[in-house]
């Protein structure tokens, strides 16, 4: 992971991007820190876990009125429906699902757009590993 942070820092410098910071650490730990919790307009994730788990990792970073956008593969309607209760518990609401195909292919992808409508309860995210082992439902 530190290699990724170093790469991002170099990319920011080369591109002249300012007022941005790449940090190394666990999402579950940083989300408990007031400097990061509910401070961002947008949080994005790639398809590394189910939507309920990703929401528990990401929604605590998003301030009210902001968005969490999850990049997922294929059709995600069933997964999204199964995660709605968890998303609501975490302060979010699914606003839309955008389906698209990657250029020059028939590979389907989707973006699940979740709006943050209320603050995430302080007990979330749970300790490291718990969201993955015991997803909210």
What are these regions (language model features)?
Residues 4-6, 76, 80:
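Short alpha-helix immediately C-terminal to the canonical SAM-binding loop
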Residues 1-49, 55-56:
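Conserved SAM/SAH cofactor-binding pocket of Class I
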Residues 28, 73-77, 102:
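Short "lid" loop at the C-terminus of a central beta-strand within the Rossmann-like core
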Residues 81-137:
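SAM/dcSAM-binding transferase cores
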Residues 48, 71-75, 99:
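Short strand-turn motif at the edge of the Rossmann-like AdoMet-binding core
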Residues 62-64:
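Helix-to-beta-strand junctions that scaffold the AdoMet/dcAdoMet cofactor pocket
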Residues 8, 72, 114:
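Residue-level signal for inorganic ion chemistry
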């Amino acid at each position: 992971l530190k290699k990724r942070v170093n790469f991002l820092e170099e990319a920011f410098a080369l591109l002249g991007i300012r007022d941005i910071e790449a940090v190394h650490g666990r999402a579950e730990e940083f989300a408990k820190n007031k400097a990061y919790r509910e401070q961002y307009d947008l949080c994005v994730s790639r398809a590394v876990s189910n939507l309920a788990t990703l929401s528990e990792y990401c929604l605590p970073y998003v301030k009210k009125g902001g968005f969490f956008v999850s990049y997922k593969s294929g059709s995600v309607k069933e997964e999204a429906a199964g995660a709605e209760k968890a998303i609501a518990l975490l302060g979010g609401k699914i606003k839309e699902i955008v389906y698209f195909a990657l250029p020059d292919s028939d590979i389907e992808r989707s973006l699940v757009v979740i709006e943050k409508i209320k603050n995430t309860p302080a007990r979330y995210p749970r300790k490291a590993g718990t969201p993955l082992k015991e997803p909210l439902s």
